[in-house]
Structure formats: structure tokens, C-alpha cells
Amino acid sequence: MKDLLKFLKQQSKTEEFNGIKIGLASPDLIRSWSFGEVKKPETINYRTFKPEREGLFCARIFGPVKDYECLCGKYKRLKHRGVICEKCGVEVTQTKVRRERMGHIDLASPVAHIWFLKSLPSRIGLMLDMTLRDIERVLYFESFVVIEPGMTTLERGQMLTEETYLDALEEYGDEFEAKMGAEAVLELLRAINLAEQIEQMREELPSINSETRRKKVTKRLKLMEAFFTSGNKPEWMILKVLPVLPPDLRPLVPLDGGRFATSDLNDLYRRVINRNNRLKRLLDLAAPDIIVRNEKRMLQESVDALLDNGRRGRAITGSNKRPLKSLADMIKGKQGRFRQNLLGKRVDYSGRSVITVGPTLRLHQCGLPKKMALELFKPFIYGKLEARGLATTIKAAKKMVEREQAEVWDVLDEVIREHPVMLNRAPTLHRLGIQAFEPVLIEGKAIQLHPLVCAAYNADFDGDQMAVHVPLTLEAQLEARALMMSTNNILSPANGEPVITPSQDVVLGLYYTSRECINGRGEGMAFADVSEVEKAYATGVAELHARVKVRITETNIADDGERTKSTRIIDTTVGRALLSLILPEGLSYDLVNQNMGKKQISKLLNTCYRQLGLKDTVIFADQLMYTGFRFATISGASVGIDDMVIPDEKYTLVADAEAEVLEIQEQFQSGLVTAGERYNKVIDIWASANEKVSKAMMENLSTETVINRDGVPEQQASFNSIYMMADSGARGSAAQIRQLAGMRGLMAKPDGSIIETPITANFREGLNVLQYFISTHGARKGLADTALKTANSGYLTRRLVDVAQDLVVIEDDCGVEHGLTMKPLIEGGDVVEPLRERVLGRVVALDVMKPGTNEVLAPRNTLLDEAWCNTLEEHSIDEVIVRSVITCDTDFGVCAACYGRDLARGHIINHGEAIGVVAAQSIGEPGTQLTMRTFHIGGAASRASAENNVQVKNAGSLKLHNAKHVSNIDGKLVIVSRSSELAIIDELGREKERYKVPYGTVLEKLEDSEVAAGEIIANWDPHTHPIISEVAGSVKFVDMIDGVTMTRQTDELTGLSSVVVLDVGARTSAGKELRPAIRLVDADGNDLMIPGTEVPAQYFLPGNAIVSKDDNAKINVGDPLARIPQESSKTRDITGGLPRVADLFEARKPKEPAILAEISGTISFGKETKGKRRLVITPADGSEHYEEMIPKWRNLNVFEGEKVERGEVIADGPEAAHDILRLRGIHNVANYIVNEVQDVYRLQGVKINDKHIEVIIRQMLRKCLITSTGDTEFLEGEQAEVSRVKIANRELIAQGKTPATFERELLGITKASLATESFISAASFQETTRVLTEAAVGGKSDPLRGLKENVIVGRLIPAGTGYAYHKTRNEERAKILSSRGKVETTTVTASEAEKNLADLLNLAGSQD
């Protein structure tokens, strides 16, 4: 019997497939699926519980209710398999056919499919070139549409209301034909001749001038071509036959008490059948038109509700007032088929329990409660018991296990040996959220977890729960052990740093051990070796912190693995000598001869991993942990109230601040400062007071003065518990200590603005009621934020995963010759990220030369590891061009060389590594640590914005970047270009600092001259924008008429008069057309030219410009001619944290973005309109000029006659990524996004490797716009996949034809996910209805290339260990295809050919 079932099972299995195609079903196809027509709305007979005949659950159509038994009971048992009972008509077979057999309903009148009607853009509307409203009016019987105009003046597709229809009937009789309802639409669709229409539209496309019309025609053409190539017929968008879902997929379950629980679909089907039957009856009776029409409309509405309830009109509700769940609702959303059942499934062999600490475990172990283990490993135990002969049958074994006999535990021990289990903690934000451990059986009911893996899980022991999963098959166990074992996941995939670093108690213990104390017991002793130190400590002769001399022996391991020993005497402490006992051979003693804070320990582990490899590191990490716990216990460090020492200066500092605030208040009342200034100043005062208090407090806490052996006072770090905890990095921070022992400081309101009365008390003194109330404000906001943040962060991660999920490493080297230029990140006077951190683990794209020679230092395709980075630093290399995934040339995936090092393993990345998902997780996982708020600039920040000079921090020489300058009369340089930057270079040629300097800056030093640290080298006026003269001569006023276009003003304080140009709005009508300007002339009155051009030196003056020279005054080079007052730019809120990251990845346009120059050329202004000015850029080569209207309130950085380069900033503002891509290219946009995202994460102290962000950017740049079509199939202005276009172009070039040209396009991650090649992946992400509608109309085929699609269809994913399976399958398929191709020539459409070719190329790529 068993074998027979097995055989039957094998029969029904489908063979392997390579793609999934979706299309429209024709009425015949629907009938061919069906096993019979459902004619009655009845479901089950409520007395007998048997399905009604020809009803929705009919056994004759859908199959038997019980296995191998017909409905009337005439045939039972297996022997009658396949017989159709002559009495009840039911086939005798398994009951599971009721899950797969479909029925159908023949509709009495055709019905439009709501998806193709209402899902925007309406496909039926596009096809017929009618508006959605018109079609709806036809479908819902409000007006007629002409189908056959005959010999009349009517046109086909014309709408007629009831009255006009009757008039036309009177006029023309039956010359013409007009109908209403879906029949009419069906006729219109049927009459379309696709091939003719396509031909005609392709011909008229080039001659269309209007942009909107062209877009519309292109859209329609695309739709028609999709129909044409896919073999779908337009009339199939109208249903004549409705398929009925198999009954077991919409079950009806009898509850006790004679009621039934039912799926909503049954209700919806019943309505359709009722209305359909009523309509049939009315048609048979030849009822009046109006009644039939009404019934047809109701039928249309009920089918709409069945397919997608609530898309049109109000949703149909059930008895309990909630809308019924239609077919569309079954598949979309979090609870729909895709996300609930296909992407996430429940698993068996799992258990969950609370976790507790397992401080005695090794890193690869976890403690598993016996009870859980027994339950989880039951099948293994049964098998073992039977094999041992302890139980005769499975049943007996089961009894033994239930009784928990003694032998069972022995067997369990054996089964568990070396059988890893997987532990998972929700939320699993990155791949370290599931790791494998070897179980150790323990008493009790809580899982024990090794403390060092807590950081990876983000777990703590305040009641967290974890799930245990058992890998069953041998392969699964192998993968768990080789890939997921906690000992194999030491480095974080996000940044390549160790993720197994001690924290909290362990750090405190190690820090305490390694501290030194003056006058410790045993100070000054000398020891022969480390073991002697141990004896001294154990016997109590020397204490842990005593300074001693020790002779140590170090092992040095050379690159070739040769070991040499060296001995030296070293000044150290007893504790550090003890630490060196656990130090693995080959590491230097200096690594522990320091105060071991968290950073130092992390560095120690990192060094260990890089020098000695995995095994030593794992053992060492465990030893560190045991030692740390031991000494943390011995130290007895705890928090007591006396540890919070309040500095004496606090009270005077607070009093001073209060006095200052009073003074400001008085100034405000006498009207000297504005309310805003007062507020900002008050906040500044308190912020600085707070700083001073906390500084005083930290100085007080951190050191104490001790008299040493020689009787000299010496400073030593304090052993205050709170200070030690913060200093070591175990817990707490200076900011928190400040609140305990300093003052709490300023608090924020929930809207982010700062309350100007600070809390001057600290927690030790205690808060009064008012202070407490202010505190609660912020605290409550924090809690609310956290809840929102989690949801937002999760959604960001989901979008990232979705956009990047199909990126896998598929070849070694794509051979591309360029990449991204990497420089150290310098902001102002600080190197934020040195070059080595940016290029570590990347591959060089172009040879790196030794500076000043043409000798190659690092050849192309070198993987830069730590040693190489040191070499680069020694030669003070300042920039390296490295390979990047953004420029990788592989078609469907990336190559290993462009990606570089696998961060979690430390070697070049393997084939099949799913870098897309890793990148998404690495960026999404820290999302919960980012803030949600936008920062309001208040107080300290608003002052810094108006800086007016550059003061350097390091000595070096001065370099200017893209700067034009002139020398003024004092020999100083004046900058006359926009985005200029000034850099300080040290003697090795490395850049140390970089500053932006605005137009009109006066430099105190010449280029390449030496500057000293702290020198001020550049000055400018932040409040006005000067116009600098580039030639010497005399000033000539043009159109400057006193009282018309300008006024004279005299400064009260200095008595100097100056000329102010009137704004256009303030002039009289006479002055409206005049354009005031300054012309520069020589002594003879001839125009001077701007150097290097034929342009006369004439400077047009905008409104409000202040001219300080008089007419005919002499002027020198570099002097300011006029000044334009700058309104201090409105303090913009900086969007910070998570929203900023989301905005960047969604490539959203900022409000009021910077305006960039579209082409290079000379600026001039055309005719102004009411609110805008016209900016014209004329290129030097005389080609087409470009003009743009700019609102007047925008502050322009340019004036007439100035030259700009393409992509330069014309008006300040946040830059839009799209503009950067268009005007400055891919490299710049990549740099921009990477740096901006990194800024947000850096602020929170989160390290993420640039690679991950680049991976996402690559996916955002997946699509391109076709600019010219060449000989390809693409349409101009069409959006296409870049890899597709590249493949098509390669073919064409091989055939000697013209390829298409394209512009890369930047899509936000949501848009990019929805635009993927795979409709299955897109549908399971968002907007399921729209995606599926579009795919069905185009008859799309999903090549199942990404990870998500393969999970959904239930295959191994084409990454990791599943990569090999897919590779071999594809190779076999290619063989079959090539052998088949020799025998028969099949007709293939262009798109299919292209797809096959793409697949083959893809294979070729993955083979080599």
C-alpha cells in the first residue's frame, strides 16, 4: 500500500522548469482547466453535510469528499480507483483532488476584468484609446458606444448618451450599430488589428512633436507590442467564462451548533451565480431592456467584487460589516499568499525558551535543556533505540521515551554528540541572528548562551527568548557546521571588525587587571619570568596593580611561518603579566602592556585574527572572557552614591551663567537684541556652562594625586568605580556621568526645540518637581520614538533587501579597466576616514605609481590587504582608483574582483556569495540605532554657520583645488571662482585638511607656501557677496540714475556714502527696463576686456547691491566693485538619522534643490518675468544656448559674464542626486550617496563598509533611458535594463550594425524593486495587483534569476551552496539547447531570442 502511494506521488510530480510565464487566459483555456460548470449557488446540505449537486462544492465536478469513496457509497476502497459511479457521477479517487480541480461559470453576458480596467494605467483604456471614465460609463450601462458606424457621420468608439442614441436611431435607422456594456467593449477590442496598428504608430512616432502626445503614443505602442509578441489577444481582458477555485482552497467548515464557518470567497461566488442565473432567466423571458441592463450591471459588479473587492465603489461587506476578502486580497499584503506562505513558512523540529548566561561554555557551545533536547531529537532517538535492539518497534521506542527510562538519556547523549543546532533570536536583522552551536545538555528549562555572541544577536538576559532549530539531513548539518557555527562568524559582515568582542563585565575585569597603581604592594620587584609573577600574585606578595619589571619571551612568526624567540625585560604591572599568560604565541606583549579598554581589546582580537587565524582567535576570545569575568568579580567594582563626586566649582559656574542670562534678558528688554537672538544666546550660555561643569567633574573624577615612593606627588588615574566603567567602555559614558554628578543640562521639548531653562541639578542631588516635569517631557518622547523607529527601520531593511536580492558573485573578473577614485575623507581640519580604511580589501583598478616616479608600486588587480595598505601609507599615496561594483561589467551579478574582500572571512569573495542581501542587512541592521528626528539648529549651531575665515590646525603647505584667482594690490590672492577648496598638505604630500572657500576670499598666503599650525590663512565677509574686478582701470556707471535705479546712503557711524541699487520692484516705471551696471574702461575710455576673452568687462548689478566706488574712480585688480548683501540663509533643519538614509536611497528630490549648470558656458540674464529671472548659458563653441527660469528669491552664486562649468552650482541648496548623475556622471553620484549615508551612520558611531552602499547604488542604477535606438528593438525614451541594452549592443556591434545609446537613470529603491526583470519578486514586494496586471498583459516570463523568486517557487536559491546546483542545471540545459538547435529550427520571436542569448551569455560568464 505504502509503495503504491509512493508510486502515485511520483507520477504527479512536474519535471524541472526554467521559468514561469504569466499571461491572459482565453475562455477556451479556462474551460479546459475546468471539470464542470457550477450552476447552482448551493454549498452543502445542512442536514446531511453532503455537497449539493452542481453547487459550489459539487463532488461530481470537484472530486470525492472521502478518499476512494463515491458520494452515494456504492464504490469504496482502493480497488475501484478511477471508476466513475453511475449513480452519483463521482470519480473514485483521492480527496486531495478537491484542492486542484477547478470548475467554471459560463457568464450570460461578458464581464470586464476589473484589474485590466481599474489598475492604473487602465490597459483596456490604453488599448482602445478611450478615457477610463468613458469606458466605465459604457460598462456600467450609462451610455452607448458606436461599434460599427456604417455610412453615417458617427465615428467608431464615439460615446452616445441615451438621448443622442435615440436621435441617431431616428436619423440613420439601422445603418449603424451601437451597444452598451461589456459586449460593446469586447466588440471594440476584437476589432483591433494589432499588427496594422503597431506598424502605423511606429511610422508616425518620429513626426510627433508634442512631448505629451509622444509619451502617450509610446505607451500605447509598448502595450500593443506586448500583446502582439506575447500572443495574448486584447479581447481576453473581457471575461466570458469565470474560473471557480477548487473547493478545498475556500473551505466550508461546520461548527458545533449547526453554524458554518466559511471562506468569504464562497459568498462572493454565490452572488455571481445567483445574478448570472437570474440574468439567464430574464434573457429567456425576453424581459424589458432596462431590467436586463440592470441585471447585467449587477453581474459586472459582483464579478468585480469577487476579483478585487473595493477597487470600484464601496466594498461588499459580510454579515459582520467587514469587507469580504476577495481573490486579490488573498495574494497581496503581509497576510497574503506571497509574504505569509511563500516567503515565510513555519518549520517543525524547533523549540523556544528563555535564555540565560553560560559563562563556562566554550564559544561553539550552547546549553540545551534536557527536556527540549529529548523532544527535538525524538526521531533520532527512536532510530537509535531500535538499532540498539533496546526497543523492538517504533511504538515501543515511543513508550520508552515517554517514560524517560535511563537508557533514553544515554542514547540522547550519543545522538546529540557533534550534531549542531541553530539558535535564532527575533528580530533577525542580519545573518548573525541565526548561528549554529553544539548542544551541551543541562538541567533546568532555560537555554544557556555564550556571552560573547550576545552582541551579534543583540541579546540580553532580561527575559529574551530564543528559538532552537534542528538541521535534520546530513547536508544541513554540514552547512550548519561549516558556515553557521559561531566560531566561523568572528568578523562582522558589515565592517570586517570582530563582532565577538567582550563587553560590559569582561571589559571591566580586563581593564581593572591592566591598570597600574602607585605604591602598590610589591612595587619595584623584578621577576625572572611570567610564571614567577603568577606565584607572587597567588601568595599575595604582589598585588594586581603593582608596577614591576618582568623578563618576557616573545615568539615572532615570519610570513613564511618560521618562528623565532626573543627575550627582553619590560616595565609592566602584575595584572598585565597575568594577561600575557593567555596571549597566544606569536602576538607581541605590547598589545597587553596598556590599559585594556574596549577599543584596545577589539584591536587585540583583530590583530590576533589577521596574524594567527581563526582557531587561535576563538580559543583566545574564550580565555579573555573567563579571565575578564574572574577579575571583574575580584575587583568588586560597583556603583555607590559616594562615587558620584560633585565638583566644587559647579555652583559658581551655574551662578555665573545665571548672571549672564539676566544680562541678556535686560538687553532684550531694552531692545538691543531680538527674541530669537536672546533665545539662541541663552542656550549658548547654558550649553557652555554645562560643558565647563562636566569638564570640572571629569577632571575631579579621573585623576588623583598620590605621593610616590620617592616622595614626589604624581598624578594617577583614579580607581573610582563609575569612572572605571566609563573609561574602559564597559558601561556608561561621560555624558551619563555628567547627569549623575554634574548637571543634567538642557532638555528638549517633544518637537525637538530646546527648553531654555536647564536642569541645574544632577541625579545625586535629586530633582525638584519642576525639573522632574521637564525631564519627563524628553523621556516620553524617547519611548514613543523607539516604537516608531523599529517599524521604520524594518521597512527600510525590507526595501533594501528587495532591491538587492538578486546580486550574486558569479565570475572572477569582468575585466573592466576603471573604477572609483578613493581619497581620504577630510572635513575641515580633520581626517574623518583615512585612505587605508577606505581601500582595505578592495582591488586596484589602475596601477598605483610611486609618487614622483613612473615606477609601479601596486599593479592593477592587486587585492589591498593590511600589508599593502601599510606600503601605500609609507609611500604617502593620496588617492587610489579601486574597482567597484558600481562600475562592474558583469551582466547579471558582479565579479569577485570588483567586490574585493569578503568582509566576514578576510579573503577575496567566493562565487555564489549573496552580496546583495548581505549589503542590505548591513545597512538595515543598525537602522534601529539611528535617530528619527530632524535636528533643529538652535544655539551653538547657528553661530558656526557664519564662519568667516580658515584657521589651519596642522603645519604644511597650501594647495588650491579648482580655484581661479587674481592678485590684488597688496599681492594677496583673491579667489574669483565658485566651488573652490583649499587644502593643507604635509611634508609627505598627504592631505591633512580641506576647506571650502567662497568667491571673494582673500588669501593671506600664496599657493605652495608654508603655513604654520593655528595660522589664519583666508578671510571673507560672510554677510555680503562681493563682485571682484579682474582688471585695473576706471569705473563707468551704466544706467545708474540717482533716484530712478539707485539711491545714495550715508552710514551714520562712519559718514561714508555709498550707492545702493534699487530692487526692480521698488523702481518707478521709468527705471523698470533699465539695467544698472558697472563698466571698466582704460584711461582713454575704451572698454577693457576680461583677461583671456573677448568679453568687455561689464558687471550688471542686481537689486540691493551696494557700490562703494564712485563714477570714474580708479580701481585695481582684485578690488571689490560692489557688494550684494546675503540674507543669512534660513537655518534649514538638518534631516538626520533614519529619514535621511531613506531619502538618499529613495533618491528623493529635496525641497528647493541646488540649481546646477546644465552646460558649460558664459552666464547672462534674459528678460525677467514677474516672479522669475531668465538665466541663459551660452557655450563658447557657439552651439545651442540653454535657458532656464529661476525664481527671484533664489540666491544666485553667479553674475553676468561669468563662466561656469557643467554641473557647477548656480544657486545654493541641497543637491539632488538625479542632477548629479545627469551633469557630473556616475562616479560623482556614487561618491555623493556613499558619503551622505556614511555621515549619518558615522554620527551614531556605526561602521559600515562603503562596499555595501555601493552595492545598493548599483541596483539603483540598473535602468537606463534609451536616447537613440540604433538598430535595436528598443523605443526612444523607453526605460530598459542596462544589462539588456549592453547585451543587445554587443550583438549588434558583432554584426556591424549601429548600437543604441542610453543615459543611466537613478531610481529610488522602491521603484527599482518594482522595476526588476522578475515579476514574481516585484509582486511579492509591493503593489501586487499592478505588477501582476502588467506582467500578464505583456505575457512576461520570469527567468527565476534572483533569490526571492526561487524561494517562492520552492527551489534552492542560486547563491551559497545552491549556486553549484543552479550552475550545473544551467550547463545541462545549455547542452540540451545546443543539441536541439542542430536538429530543428524553431521560430522564435526577437524577445525570446534575446532572452535565450542573455541566458547563454550569463552561463558563459559563470563558467569561466
UniProtKB/Swiss-Prot annotation:
Gene Ontology biological process terms, A to Z: DNA-templated transcription
GO cellular component: DNA-directed RNA polymerase complex
EC number per UniProt: 2.7.7.6
Pfam families with a match to the protein in the record: RNA_pol_Rpb1_1 (PF04997), RNA_pol_Rpb1_2 (PF00623), RNA_pol_Rpb1_3 (PF04983), RNA_pol_Rpb1_4 (PF05000), RNA_pol_Rpb1_5 (PF04998)
Binding positions for Zn(2+) 2 per the UniProt entry: 814, 888, 895, 898
Binding site for Zn(2+) 1: 70, 72, 85, 88
Domain of life (superkingdom): Bacteria
SMART domains: RPOLA_N
Gene3D superfamilies xrefs: 1.10.132.30, 1.10.150.390, 1.10.1790.20, 1.10.40.90, 2.40.40.20, 2.40.50.100, RNA polymerase II, clamp domain (4.10.860.120), RNA polymerase Rpb1, domain 3 (1.10.274.100)
Binding site for Mg(2+): 460, 462, 464
Enzyme class of the recorded protein, top EC level: transferase
Textual note on the cofactor: Binds 1 Mg(2+) ion per subunit. Binds 2 Zn(2+) ions per subunit.
Reactions listed under catalytic activity: RNA(n) + a ribonucleoside 5'-triphosphate = RNA(n+1) + diphosphate
InterPro entries in the record: DNA-dir_RpoC_beta_prime (IPR045867), DNA-dir_RpoC_beta_prime_bact (IPR012754), RNA_pol_asu (IPR000722), RNA_pol_N (IPR006592), RNA_pol_Rpb1_1 (IPR007080), RNA_pol_Rpb1_3 (IPR007066), RNA_pol_Rpb1_3_sf (IPR042102), RNA_pol_Rpb1_4 (IPR007083)
Cofactor annotation: Mg(2+); Zn(2+)
Keywords attached to this entry: DNA-directed RNA polymerase, Magnesium, Metal-binding, Nucleotidyltransferase, Transcription, Transferase, Zinc
Positions of disulphide bridges: none
Molecular functions per Gene Ontology: DNA binding; DNA-directed RNA polymerase activity; magnesium ion binding; zinc ion binding
Family recorded in the similarity comment: Belongs to the RNA polymerase beta' chain family.
Function of the molecule: DNA-dependent RNA polymerase catalyzes the transcription of DNA into RNA using the four ribonucleoside triphosphates as substrates.
Subunit structure: The RNAP catalytic core consists of 2 alpha, 1 beta, 1 beta' and 1 omega subunit. When a sigma factor is associated with the core the holoenzyme is formed, which can initiate transcription.
Cross-referenced PANTHER family: DNA-DIRECTED RNA POLYMERASE, DNA-DIRECTED RNA POLYMERASE SUBUNIT BETA
Name the record gives this protein: DNA-directed RNA polymerase subunit beta'
Organism from which the protein derives: Shewanella frigidimarina (strain NCIMB 400)
Gene for this chain: rpoC
